[in-house]
């Protein structure tokens, strides 16, 4: 626990709300917040105590693609700005490719593959290939990549 005064704690809360672009939302009830705003509140709550690690479980679930991109960008900015290690559990390939640096692919609770997003496009691991290329967009990216490298 902390020895901060109530005024100091309120100042810190307002700072992190501002950091996640919710500076005018501190008087709103949860039901008054959109899904994206609720995700940003969760991030603010996670960083208010200056953690060394940020854990995000499906940060984009239930969000439209545009809001999901906003959340991805915010997570990346927070990770860089606070110099923290961020661990994200997601099934969203767009997020993996957008903000994943070191990617660990699990299957049935066991490590199946590990590498970078670039290496993910090159792997022959069948489970990873099936997951990554379940999207037509990523299938086209892989085909273009393989044509370039051959």
Positions of the model-derived regions?
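Conserved ABC ATPase "signature" region
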Residues: 6-24
